[in-house]
Design a protein with these regions (language model features):
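Flexible, glycine-rich beta-alpha linker
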Residues: 126-128, 154, 171-201
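Active-site Tyr-X1-5-Lys
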Residues: 141, 150-180
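Alpha-helical substrate-binding/gating segment
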Residues: 188-191, 196-211, 218-246, 255
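Conserved Rossmann-fold NAD(P)-dependent oxidoreductase catalytic core, especially the SDR/UDP-sugar
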Residues: 105-152
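NAD(P)H-binding glycine-rich loop region in Rossmannoid oxidoreductase-like domains
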Residues: 45-100, 109
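N-terminal Rossmann NAD(P)H-binding glycine-rich loop of SDR-like oxidoreductase domains
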Residues: 6-26
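Glycine-rich NAD(P)-binding loop of the Rossmann-fold in SDR/ketoreductase-type enzymes
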Residues: 90, 94-105, 113, 157-158, ...
Length: 304
C-alpha cells in the first residue's frame, strides 16, 4: 500500500524536528522551508526552498500537486533570530499580518491543487486571554476549543485569525470543502528545573519561575504525543461536525494531570490518545522543586 503524500511547511523548524524521525517513515513527505538549515546549524535533508509569504503563488504552487495532506508549521517570528532585543508586543502587528497572509497562501494553494486535508499549527495562544486572566487567577478550570478565541497579544490574535480564515475554505462556499484541523499546540520544550529557579528569566506566561514551571507541567506535549496528534489530524477518516463542516479545533498537549485545556475534540474527531503525563515524566523534578524540604508552594495547577 502506497504512503499518503504529505507536504510539511516549516520543515527545518523545531516542531518539525520532533516529528520527522517518525513521519519520514509514515508518510511520503515533501518538505519545505525558507532554509534547509535548522537552528543548530544542521542541514535537513530533502527541504525545498519556498517563501510562502510571497504573494506570487506561481513560485511554489507546484509543490502542492498530487499532495493529499498539508502540515503547516511555518511562521515568521516577531523578532529575527539572533537579534539582541525583541520588538515590543505592540509593534508586532505587521509581522503577524504577514503570517496570516502566508496561511491564506497555503490554504489557497491546497484548495487549488485538490489537497483533501490540512493540519495547521495554531497555538494555545489563540485563546490565551482565558489562561492569563482566569486560569492563573483560579477563576476558570479548563479552556475548551469551543470557547470564543480571545488573545491578549498579536501572536495569539494571528493564530485565531488562522482558524477563522480557514472556515470559508472548509465550509465549501468556494465549491468544495477543504478539510481542516487546527491544532492549538502547547509547550513543546523539555522541562528543565534550573530554568525555573528564582534567578531565571523563564516567566513568559506567569509572574514567577515556579508558576511558569507549574504552567508548563500542564501545557507540555511530548514528542510522541505531538507526532501522534499531527498524524491523526491527517488520517482521521471523518472530521465533519454536526453541521457537516469538516473543521476541527483541538488542543495539543499530553494527558497531563495539571493540564488546563480540554482534549475533548481531539479525542472525539481525531481519536487522539496521548500517552504521556508530566506528573510521571517529571516526577523527580516536581518533588525537588514543589515538594522538597523548605518549600511552601501551593499544590495543584498553575494559579495563585
Amino acid at each position: 500500500m502506497s504512503k499518503r503524500k504529505v507536504l510539511i511547511t516549516g520543515a527545518s523548524g523545531y516542531i518539525a524536528s520532533l516529528m520527522l524521525p517518525t513521519l519520514r517513515d509514515h508518510f511520503d513527505l515533501t518538505l519545505t522551508d525558507i532554509s534547509e538549515i535548522d537552528r543548530d546549524g544542521n542541514k535537513v535533508e530533502g527541504v525545498n526552498i519556498a517563501n510562502f509569504i510571497d504573494p506570487d503563488r506561481s513560485k511554489y504552487e507546484h509543490l502542492f500537486e498530487n499532495i493529499s495532506g498539508v502540515i503547516h508549521l511555518a511562521f515568521k517570528p516577531h523578532t529575527p533570530r539572533g537579534a539582541k532585543t525583541e520588538n515590543a508586543p505592540i509593534d508586532r502587528f505587521d509581522n503577524e499580518h504577514e503570517n496570516i497572509q502566508m496561511a491564506n497562501n497555503i490554504y489557497r494553494c491546497a484548495y487549488d491543487a485538490g489537497v483533501s486535508r490540512l493540519a495547521i499549527a495554531s497555538s494555545n495562544h489563540a485563546a490565551d486571554w482565558y489562561e492569563h486572566s482566569l486560569i492563573h487567577e483560579r477563576k476558570m478550570d479548563l479552556v475548551r476549543p469551543t470557547d470564543f478565541p480571545v488573545s491578549d497579544n498579536f501572536y495569539g490574535w494571528a493564530k485565531a485569525a488562522y482558524e477563522l480564515l480557514a472556515w470559508p475554505y472548509a465550509c465549501g462556499i468556494f465549491g468544495r470543502k477543504l478539510e481542516t484541523v487546527m491544532l492549538r499546540i502547547g509547550f513543546t520544550r523539555p522541562i528543565i528545573v534550573t530554568d525555573y529557579l528564582s534567578d531565571s528569566p523563564m516567566t513568559e506566561q506567569t509572574s514567577s519561575g515556579i508558576a511558569e514551571f507549574k504552567r508548563n507541567l500542564g501545557a507540555y506535549i511530548s514528542p510522541r504525543d505531538i507526532t501522534q496528534l499531527f498524524s491523526r489530524a491527517i488520517e482521521a477518516p471523518n472530521i465533519e461536525n454536526e453541521h457537516g463542516i469538516p473543521f476541527v479545533i483541538a488542543y495539543g498537549c499530553s494527558d497531563n494531570t495539571r493540564r488546563f485545556w480540554s482534549l475533548e475534540t481531539g479525542r472525539k474527531y481525531l481519536d487522539y490518545q496521548p500517552k504521556d503525563d508530566t506528573e510521571i515524566i517529571y516526577a523527580d523534578e516536581i518533588r525537588d522543586l514543589l515538594t522538597g524540604d523548605g518549600t511552601v508552594i501551593r499544590g495543584g495547577k498553575v494559579g495563585i
